[in-house]
From Swiss-Prot:
SUPFAM superfamilies referenced in this protein's UniProt entry, alphabetically: TPR-like
Tissue note: Expressed in spermatozoa (at protein level).
Protein's recorded name: Tetratricopeptide repeat protein 29
Key words, A-Z: Cell projection, Cilium, Cytoplasm, Cytoskeleton, Disease variant, Flagellum, Repeat, TPR repeat
Compositional bias segments (type: Basic and acidic residues): 459-475
GO cellular component annotations of the record: cytoplasm; cytoskeleton; sperm flagellum
Major location (coarse): cytoplasm
TPR repeats by residue range: 92-131, 136-173, 182-215, 234-267, 274-307, 314-347, 354-387
């Protein structure tokens, strides 16, 4: 394509007159006269600016987009011109639609982006040349270069267009044992996954996985294509299973996650295998298959321990605690939650600490261990204050308030049951101040022993009175 320096701004008389009469002028001039004057200008420029042909003058006068299109047609690249023109039309349509939706949409028209036009011209024409020679690998490489160039948030639809072209061409390439086809399936899977079409994405990722089995192919960064296929399939299967679990399709979700687990083992990546086990365990928990869930989650914890991955191990303890809680095994659930709290604290995982403390507090509160519940909820609340998270702060504050109320409840009940003047005075004093209610300091044996036991060991008394079965088990 010819590019010329700007012409001098000093204009001869003919040029100055012509600028006033060209179509951009507001005057109404007959078309025949304009054509004649245009020819006169071309002749004048050809005579007075030596070395400028009529085509070069036209190249200077026309827009960059028009020059690109003219060059394509003049050089015989009719397919490239057709594809470029269709892309420009769609570009303008999308730009107009976006402009209507948002007043602040700032993407430039394609004709105002010469770098992109240059890329399109260069690689489309080279791809067309290669197609004429039936060199399909070169066709694919040129189209793939365009897909990579347009891999950004604004131009993603252009990238997807060239991914689709690459996919069609890759199926014609036979000399690489299917590597290009495998990569094309990977890109098509990504295209559908980003669009939320998970079933279509899974189909392409399955084909990608099948084509890479037993191969040592690597991508541009040196990563194994088979490992990438396993990761892509696991990610898609997990997203599919999430939707199935939302719809309470537990059997289908478990089935697809078992398949994901098998693929993860094939990939020989322990981290990936652990992730598959974790989500499979959660699916069994949702389906109320508790024993199976415990078995699978135990496998996850063992792999996490082997990998020395504390954060994953903490997540496993949390999941196991949920299963045990669902089974009514509160004592065992508390053990795992304490481990989860310890890991979260040691690794400065504040959100995990809030979640673990809240779960632990809920169990203590349910069992009537109000002092311990209050301590757990206070820990959760203090952590949310450090995080400056208002929604979490409000939630933990409610839990903490309920636990404190339960903690005070036993002392208040004992004052009421005593039914004497001193107890009444304490209750009235507390009602006025609404502070922490103090135990009765009266030294009588029956009152002192009762209040002291309530204030210092309320959770132990509750265990004796309300959960005799648990006490027997402990002894």
């Amino acid at each position: 394509m010819t590019t010329l320096p700007p012409l001098p701004m000093t204009r001869p008389k003919l040029t100055a007159l012509a600028r006033q009469k060209l179509p951009c002028s507001s005057r109404k001039i007959p078309r025949s006269q304009l054509i004649k004057e245009k020819d006169d200008i071309d002749h004048y420029l050809e005579v007075n600016f030596k070395g400028l042909s009529k085509e070069e003058v036209a190249a200077y006068r026309n827009s960059y987009k028009k020059n690109i299109c003219v060059d394509m047609l003049r050089d015989g690249y009719h397919k490239s011109f057709t594809e470029l023109f269709a892309l420009m039309e769609r570009w303008d349509a999308l730009r107009e639609a976006a402009r209507v939706r948002s007043l602040f949409w700032l993407q430039k028209p394609l004709e105002e982006q010469p770098d992109k036009l240059d890329y399109l011209y260069h690689y489309l024409t080279r791809a067309e040349d290669a197609e004429r020679k039936e060199s399909f690998e070169d066709v694919h490489n040129n189209l793939y270069a365009l897909a990579c160039y347009f891999n950004n948030s604004e131009d993603k639809w252009v990238r997807n267009h060239f991914y689709e072209r690459c996919f069609k061409i890759a199926q014609l390439i036979k000399i690489d044992c299917g590597k290009k086809e495998a990569e094309a399936h990977m890109h098509m899977g990504l295209l559908y996954e980003e669009d939320g079409q998970l079933l279509e994405a899974a189909e392409h990722y399955e084909a990608f996985h099948q084509l890479t089995q037993g191969r040592i192919w690597k991508d541009e960064t040196g990563r194994s294509l088979n490992l990438l296929a396993c990761e892509s399939l696991l990610r898609t299967y997990r997203l599919l299973s999430d939707k199935m679990l939302e719809n309470k399709e537990y059997k289908q979700a478990i089935k697809i996650l078992i398949k994901a687990s098998e693929i993860a083992k094939e990939g020989s990546d322990k981290k990936m295998e652990a992730e598959a086990s974790y989500y499979l365990g959660l699916a069994h928990l949702a389906a109320e298959e508790y024993e199976t869930a415990l078995t699978v989650l135990d496998t996850y914890c063992k792999i996490s321990t082997d990998l020395d991955d504390d954060l994953s191990l903490g997540r496993g303890y949390e999941a196991i605690a949920k299963v045990l809680q669902s089974q009514g095994e509160m004592t065992e659930a508390i053990k795992y939650l304490k481990k989860f709290v310890k890991i979260a604290r040691n690794n400065f995982q504040s959100l995990d600490l809030v979640r673990a403390s809240t779960m632990l507090g809920d169990i203590y509160n349910e069992k009537g261990y109000y002092n311990k519940a209050s301590e757990c909820f206070q820990q959760a609340f203090d952590t949310t204050v450090e995080l400056m998270s208002m929604p979490l702060m409000d939630e933990t504050k409610v839990h903490y308030g309920i636990a404190k109320a339960h903690q005070m409840m036993l002392t208040v009940n004992n004052y009421i049951e005593s039914a004497d003047l001193t107890s009444l005075n304490y209750l009235l004093s507390w009602k006025e101040s609404r502070g922490n209610i103090e135990p009765d300091p009266v030294t009588e044996e029956f009152r002192g022993s009762t209040v002291e036991a309530v204030s210092q060991n309320s959770e132990r008394l509750e265990e004796l009175s309300r959960f005799p079965g648990d006490q027997k088990n402990e002894t």
